[in-house]
């Protein structure tokens, strides 16, 4: 377990992620299970499947991908984020955009968020790729908001836990689907749009 969010701990967390490990990381909303999300590395390490197994989450429900800067999304999607939404970043706003080739051959979409937490953005930047993030809980159960609860339930199933204190009462991110030049709020969270 890491108890300090600093430059060294960001490097350590990134090293775990780059090796295909699953980490519990604090975000600007709640604690999240995280793993490397870059397509070729994810396939090599199976991070998606590892997180799904821990959570008991069905395969058709995708994970949010966290990016280190809003500009990073242009690597994966040609969709332009409307200025009114872009102004909310970094922060607890998740946008769902279509993926471009070669990341998707079908009309697939992905949910991206640029978190407000600078330490977490440094971890992601150190990885060099987006990372998955999904709330720390078993599917269908309440989100765990304290490291004590997380450690008790998941310490034998994850490779690293970063302690940033309790996240009691934290709201999840707001999720917005972008399409046809407009957007639709799918989940109202801590950011008002």
List PLM regions with ranges:
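Active-site-adjacent structural elements in enzyme catalytic cores
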Residues: 1-193
